[in-house]
A protein has these predicted regions:
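Conserved "HGTGT" condensation-loop signature of ketosynthase/thiolase-family condensing enzymes
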Residues: 1-104
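Active-site-proximal alpha-helical scaffold in enzymes
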Residues: 106-132
């Protein structure tokens, strides 16, 4: 991995997305991307009494779907980078706690997705160098 200029990183091994999973709410399900979602909810609260509980359930089910689709056993997941907009990553924290892996909470509001991809990519690149070289 090389730093090019002040903000650009060139990876020795480009990051690769092996699998995806997504659960969408009713508004997203009504849009043109509905066919790409793994599951579409009729109720954005998914039967829960609070947004925190609903989003924790969505995080947990989405991660379980991702693990299932990837074929990678959950005990092989070594780290998780995630974030949400509720109460200091509470939905991600509770949704991921049964996975029992180190969790890196990201506080980036709208940038959470891209920030998570960047941090995880750098982490994986460095981790692979430490472990396999």
């Amino acid at each position: 991995m090389k730093k090019l200029g002040k903000q650009t990183i060139k990876f020795d091994t480009p990051p690769t997305i092996l699998e995806t999973a997504c659960i969408a709410g009713p508004k997203e399900a009504d849009g043109p991307l509905a066919k790409y979602f793994d599951q579409c909810l009729d109720d954005e609260m998914w039967g829960e009494k609070s947004r925190e509980k609903a989003e924790s359930k969505i995080v947990k089910q989405t991660v379980n779907a991702l693990i299932s689709k990837s074929g990678i056993p959950s005990n092989k997941v070594e780290y998780c980078f995630a974030g949400d907009l509720l109460n200091q990553c509470i939905s991600s924290s509770f949704g991921l706690r049964e996975l029992n892996v180190p969790f890196y909470g990201i506080f980036g509001a709208c940038s959470t997705f891209v920030e998570g991809m960047q941090l995880a990519s750098v982490f994986i690149e460095r981790w692979n160098k430490l472990c396999y070289m």
